[in-house]
UniProtKB/Swiss-Prot annotation:
Gene Ontology terms for molecular function: catalytic activity
Pfam families per record: ThiJ_like (PF17124)
Organism: Schizosaccharomyces pombe (strain 972 / ATCC 24843) (Fission yeast)
Name of the featured protein: Uncharacterized protein C18G6.12c
Family note: To S.pombe SpAC14C4.04.
One Gene Ontology cellular component: cytoplasm
Length: 309
């Protein structure tokens, strides 16, 4: 663990119940930002359910982007009362499933740090008045099959907030005349999280991967009721011409769209690579924007010279 900035703030915990019942008696602190100014640093929103999220899908992106100078904030549906940190899916935290499908010691360590942060203990709420994703440079949508996650992914208020952001992620073309106020916007989704995009904007010209039906079906057999439910599989929600299934085996697989700064993954196995590629996509978007602005200035200068100004 490289959390030198907060190791002293962590309490001892055990692998089974630390992530379910975080035991910290410290005042929440702000996450570190390694840039010169938090206000100037890019902001990432991790969209998650307040209960039942997958630890890997939240902890690893937070760690990766925080280490690269992002301000990472968390977005849930509405305020939690009585106040508590968002809770992960506890069906994988105890018993035999914790050994087969549960989070690693590293992930549990990261979660114990998250539970000391203001950003995690007081997440933003997309149902609140005036909320917008426009304040973020990157948005990452988590997935899951349990009722709490499903409610979030199908929420029309989440869709309403996502639609304008999705369109702001359109790829900048080399010859495009960008506006002065064009901002860098990138989007990522893991497993069922991709379904929220197509429920929000079913006709968008964007391709994605998500957890394949065969993988989601096999996973559901390991989940207790009501997780093993009649929810439609995520892959069936996405239009066939926009769905990229990936290999028919449990290997890491991500897919980046050509028309939008959007990248997606299928399962927790992909989350590390997905975080890395999403960050590289952000850097590429920044380069594309600067290149377009330089080209616009070059054309403007050339036109003035040709007109004798």
């Amino acid at each position: 663990m490289a959390f030198s900035f907060q190791v002293s703030k962590m309490n001892s915990f055990d692998n089974y119940n630390a992530a379910i019942h975080p035991k910290h008696d410290l005042i929440s602190v702000n996450a570190p930002v390694f840039g010169k100014d938090a206000k100037l640093s890019p902001h990432l929103a991790i969209v998650l359910a307040d209960k039942g999220f997958m630890l890997e899908q939240v902890c690893l992106p937070w760690r990766y982007f925080t280490d690269r100078g992002f301000v990472v904030e968390f977005v849930i549906a509405e305020s939690i009362f009585p106040p508590r940190p968002p809770k992960p899916n506890d069906s994988y935290m105890t018993g035999w499933k914790s050994h087969v499908l549960g989070a690693s010691k590293e992930i549990l360590d990261i979660y114990s740090v998250l539970c000391t942060l203001n950003e995690f203990n007081n997440p933003k709420c997309y149902r609140s008045n005036g909320f917008t994703f426009d304040n973020f440079s990157a948005v990452f949508i988590t997935g899951g099959r349990n009722p709490f996650v499903r409610e979030m992914l199908e929420d029309p208020l989440l869709h309403a907030s996502l639609v304008p952001y999705i369109h702001s992620c359109r790829t900048i073309q080399p010859d495009e005349e960008v506006k002065d106020n064009r901002k860098i916007k990138v989007l990522g989704a893991i497993s069922q999280g991709a379904a929220a995009i197509y429920l929000a904007e079913p006709n968008i010209n964007m391709k994605t991967t998500t957890i394949p039906a065969w993988m989601e079906r096999s996973n559901s057999f390991l989940n207790p009721t009501p997780d093993n439910s009649t929810y439609p599989y995520a892959a069936t929600i996405i239009p066939k011409d926009k769905y990229v299934s990936g290999p028919y085996r449990r290997v890491a697989f991500t897919y980046q769209d050509e028309n939008y700064y959007y990248i997606s993954g299928r399962s927790n196995k992909d989350i590390g690579e997905l975080s890395k590629k999403m960050y590289l996509m952000y850097k590429q978007a920044y380069k594309d924007l600067n290149a377009s602005l330089r080209e616009r200035r070059r054309r403007s200068t050339s036109n003035r010279r040709n007109s004798g100004i």
